[in-house]
């Protein structure tokens, strides 16, 4: 086992006597010096060199005092910004970036995304570091007074629209209302969909994003969602809508509504139209409120109560990977079900299909009683644009899960009965590997017509490895082996071609390329095991901090952080076991580090800080994924401790991609981040469970959640002792 060394990256890995540690979560931040006390009265905030009117307006800004009572899950919002990491341009302000549904802020209803926090109780947080702002919020007690500043709502153009109901009703969908906010902090009723051919579509004036103020004489400001639906339904043929049009300023990137599908629980619109809108015998599904440009949340992270059970119509455009899902079923009329969604594939990107969906029809072909072969043919011959009628039936699908489990048990028992050394006794047949690179057969000049393309992290069952150039293999997913069978390049072929490429690249260089062959990655042998804990999560690469924070704040029941250890003395307000595990002596902690009881440790101000294996295990055994901000070295240490993490590498495609994902960093910062990521990939690729890329943080975050969903278990693939 390699020894632990002191490293210099952020959070609880410190460089001695340099910068203070930014610790692993808001619950474990060191006390920092705050600005001088600020005298606050009911009319104004008074601070040196700064004066503003509370609950009034000044210029283009307005100010509000909001009092929140801390709930079981905290205050219920996320922040970004600070002097050390500005959120918008060079502005050091502390901004609200997310309102957590059901939390204290959401229940109060006044705090909004993009609000800037000026004071927390009497603590000035206008020009402080991010960690100081978090500390101020943490130490604010159970009753927290926030003084916030926000842009004045842009002037809205109000107009009256007269609609005459047609065969498709009024022809639009709505979202919002008290207790069901479409935009956090805003109880308004918004138009979220215009149905083609409906009255609103033909009239042309009502648009997505419009706010409905009144229907005939019934006001819709600050009403329940159900009341708005009732008001629209209880109208005669002629309907007068009072509508507020958003200004262009509101549509700008900096102050647009947040990505509600990644930050908030999905709510469902109510379509103001007849159920025959889709032109099918199946009833119309309710439509998600989220704009199509936003990525959907992985289904189990939302909760099944948010998933409609009615049949719904989905249109998918076939991509280079096909439709991007696998099916099971088709025996004795049991139905065809989706068993796997390929991350990044067409089905995944559409966000409208999920594991457990029964496919009722494809392009009008009824599959309710189809065999597996008939369904596969229907999907294969469906063309580029495929219309699917699907219905979510998790209970029926669970029968397949049980069947798969029984088959797996039979195979395991059979394997135990015949011996377990199959790979050693016959290394050229019947073993499982994980791909450590992407393979596109069309880019291999010597590829076979029956070759099988695959992605990094795919598990493959090698059926026949007798040929030195090509192995016959079948793709494997967590729940079953697929019908995807073909030839993959052998380990020897991959390494020889990569060696040739590197040799040509380094031709003529002084360093040469001696020894490179050993570093070429192809495949690693894996074995399947069952786990009874929530796998720890290690995210690496650019935007990892934001992804970690969002997972913790958005899904506090599914993700958690562990309590670190330290040798420094306990402060008055700290509690042992909550803020830190306070170690009695440096010698004891050093011995534990040498005994490999820590996955990572470092020193700051002559005190040791570290994350122990036991702390991670405690979170994992509580059923929560432990979010770890550690280096890639920790992956192997966790594996050695039989706590197999999900390690996700966020790979930037280019320097421009880094700048696009994080618009508030400079080009120099982006270049350093890109270089660090490149080096990280070169050194630790084999440690990654998955590699994700994206053009925006929202796309990356969605893929991260999908990876966690797919790799959570209980059956997982882990490195095997046998080597190829």
Curated annotation (Swiss-Prot):
Phosphoserine, modified sites: 73, 142, 295, 415, 418, 422, 425, 449, 480, 606, 654
One Pfam entry name: PDZ
Region (Disordered): 15-35
PROSITE patterns cross-referenced by the UniProt entry: GUANYLATE_KINASE_1, GUANYLATE_KINASE_2, PDZ, SH3
GO terms for cellular component: adherens junction; AMPA glutamate receptor complex; cell junction; cerebellar mossy fiber; cortical cytoskeleton; cytoplasm; cytosol; dendrite cytoplasm
Keyword Transcription regulation: no
Tissue specificity remark: Brain.
Keyword terms, alphabetized: Cell membrane, Cell projection, Cytoplasm, Disease variant, Intellectual disability, Lipoprotein, Membrane, Palmitate, Phosphoprotein, Repeat, SH3 domain, Synapse, Ubl conjugation
This protein's record includes keyword Cell membrane: yes
Record field: transmembrane: none
PTM description: Palmitoylated. Palmitoylation is required for targeting to postsynaptic density, plasma membrane and synapses. Palmitoylation by ZDHHC2 occurs when the synaptic activity decreases and induces DLG4 synaptic clustering. Palmitoylation by ZDHHC15 regulates trafficking to the postsynaptic density and function in synaptogenesis. Palmitoylation may play a role in glutamate receptor GRIA1 synapse clustering. Depalmitoylated by ABHD17A and ABHD17B and to a lesser extent by ABHD17C, ABHD12, ABHD13, LYPLA1 and LYPLA2. Ubiquitinated by MDM2 in response to NMDA receptor activation, leading to proteasome-mediated degradation of DLG4 which is required for AMPA receptor endocytosis.
Location of the SH3 domain: 428-498
One biological process term in Gene Ontology: locomotory exploration behavior
Modified residues (Phosphotyrosine): 240, 580, 715
Gene3D superfamilies in the cross-refs: 2.30.42.10, Guanylate Kinase phosphate binding domain, P-loop containing nucleotide triphosphate hydrolases, SH3 Domains
List of residues that carry Phosphothreonine: 420
Lipid-modified residues, S-palmitoyl cysteine kind: 3, 5
Annotated ranges, domain PDZ: 65-151, 160-246, 313-393
An MF annotation (GO) of this entry: neuroligin family protein binding
Classification via PANTHER family: DISCS LARGE, DISKS LARGE HOMOLOG 4
Illness the protein is tied to: Intellectual developmental disorder, autosomal dominant 62: An autosomal dominant form of intellectual disability, a disorder characterized by significantly below average general intellectual functioning associated with impairments in adaptive behavior and manifested during the developmental period. MRD62 is characterized by mild to moderately impaired intellectual development.
Domain comment as written in the entry: The PDZ domain 3 mediates interaction with ADR1B. The L27 domain near the N-terminus of isoform 2 is required for HGS/HRS-dependent targeting to postsynaptic density.
Purpose of the protein: Postsynaptic scaffolding protein that plays a critical role in synaptogenesis and synaptic plasticity by providing a platform for the postsynaptic clustering of crucial synaptic proteins. Interacts with the cytoplasmic tail of NMDA receptor subunits and shaker-type potassium channels. Required for synaptic plasticity associated with NMDA receptor signaling. Overexpression or depletion of DLG4 changes the ratio of excitatory to inhibitory synapses in hippocampal neurons. May reduce the amplitude of ASIC3 acid-evoked currents by retaining the channel intracellularly.
Family of the protein in this entry: Belongs to the MAGUK family.
Designated name of the protein: Disks large homolog 4
Organism: Homo sapiens
Taxonomic lineage: Eukaryota, Metazoa, Chordata, Craniata, Vertebrata
């Amino acid at each position: 086992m390699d020894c632990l060394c002191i490293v210099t990256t952020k959070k609880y890995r410190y460089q001695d006597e340099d910068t203070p540690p930014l610790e692993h979560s808001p619950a474990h931040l060191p006390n920092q010096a705050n600005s001088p006390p600020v005298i606050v009265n009911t009319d104004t905030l008074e601070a040196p060199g700064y004066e503003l009117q509370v609950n009034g307006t000044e210029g283009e800004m307005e100010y509000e005092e909001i009092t929140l009572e801390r709930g079981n899950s905290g205050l219920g919002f996320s922040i970004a910004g600070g002097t050390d990491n500005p959120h918008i341009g060079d502005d050091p302000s502390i901004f609200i970036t997310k309102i957590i549904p059901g939390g204290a802020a959401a229940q109060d209803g006044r705090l909004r995304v993009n609000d800037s926090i000026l004071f927390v109780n009497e603590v000035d947080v206008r020009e402080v570091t991010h960690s100081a702002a978090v500390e101020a919020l943490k130490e604010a007690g159970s009753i927290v007074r926030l003084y916030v500043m926000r842009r004045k709502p842009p002037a809205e153009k109000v107009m009256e629209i007269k609609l005459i109901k047609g065969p498709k009703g009024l022809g639009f969908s709505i979202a919002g209302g008290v207790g069901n906010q479409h935009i956090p902090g805003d109880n308004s009723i918004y138009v979220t969909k215009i149905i083609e051919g409906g009255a609103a579509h033909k009239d042309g004036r009502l648009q997505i994003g419009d706010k409905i103020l009144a229907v005939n004489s019934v006001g819709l400001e600050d009403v329940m969602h159900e009341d708005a639906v009732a008001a629209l339904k209880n109208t005669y043929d002629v309907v007068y809508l009072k509508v507020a049009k958003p200004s262009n300023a509101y549509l700008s990137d900096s102050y647009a509504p947040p990505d509600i599908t990644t930050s908030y629980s999905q709510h469902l619109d109510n379509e103001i139209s007849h159920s025959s809108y889709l032109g099918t015998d199946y009833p119309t599904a309710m439509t998600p409120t989220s704009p199509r440009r936003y990525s959907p949340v992985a289904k189990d992270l939302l909760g099944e109560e948010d998933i409609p059970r009615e049949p719904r119509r989905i249109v998918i455009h076939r991509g280079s990977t096909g439709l991007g899902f696998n099916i099971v079923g088709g025996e004795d009329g049991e139905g065809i079900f989706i068993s796997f969604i390929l991350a990044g594939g067409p089905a995944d990107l559409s966000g409208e299909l999920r594991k457990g969906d029964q496919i009722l029809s494809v392009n009008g072909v009824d599959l309710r009683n189809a065999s597996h072969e008939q369904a596969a043919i229907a999907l294969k011959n469906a063309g580029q644009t495929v219309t699917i009628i699907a219905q979510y039936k998790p209970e029926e699908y669970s029968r397949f899960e049980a069947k798969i489990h029984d088959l797996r048990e039979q195979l395991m028992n059979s394997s135990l009965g015949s011996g377990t050394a199959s790979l050693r006794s016959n290394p050229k047949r019947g073993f499982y590997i994980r791909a450590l690179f992407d393979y596109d057969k069309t880019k291999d000049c010597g590829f076979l017509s029956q070759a099988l393309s695959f992605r990094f992290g795919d598990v493959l069952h090698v059926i026949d490895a007798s040929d030195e150039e090509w192995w016959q293999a079948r793709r494997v997913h967590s729940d079953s082996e697929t019908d995807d069978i073909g030839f993959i390049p052998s380990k020897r072929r991959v390494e020889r071609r990569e060696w040739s490429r590197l040799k040509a690249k380094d031709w003529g260089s002084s360093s040469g390329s001696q020894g490179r062959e050993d570093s070429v990655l192809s495949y690693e042998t894996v074995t399947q095991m069952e786990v009874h804990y929530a796998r720890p999560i290690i995210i690496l690469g650019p935007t990892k901090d934001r992804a970690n924070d969002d997972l913790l704040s958005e899904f506090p029941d599914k993700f958690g952080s562990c309590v670190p250890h330290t040798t420094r003395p306990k402060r008055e307000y700290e509690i042992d076991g909550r803020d830190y595990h306070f170690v009695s002596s440096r010698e004891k902690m050093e011995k534990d580090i040498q005994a490999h009881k820590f996955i990572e440790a470092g020193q700051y101000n002559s005190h040791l800080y570290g994350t122990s294996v036991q702390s991670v295990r405690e979170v994992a055994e509580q059923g929560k994924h432990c979010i770890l901000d550690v280096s890639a070295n920790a992956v192997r240490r966790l594996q050695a401790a039989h706590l197999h993490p999900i390690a996700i590498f966020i790979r930037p495609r280019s320097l421009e991609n880094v700048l696009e994902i994080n618009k508030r960093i400079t080009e120099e910062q982006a270049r350093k981040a890109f270089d660090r990521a490149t080096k990280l990939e070169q050194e630790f690729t084999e440690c990654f469970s998955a590699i994700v890329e994206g053009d925006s943080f929202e796309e990356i975050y969605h893929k991260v959640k999908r990876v966690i969903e797919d790799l959570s278990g209980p059956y997982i693939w882990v490195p095997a002792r046998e080597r190829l």
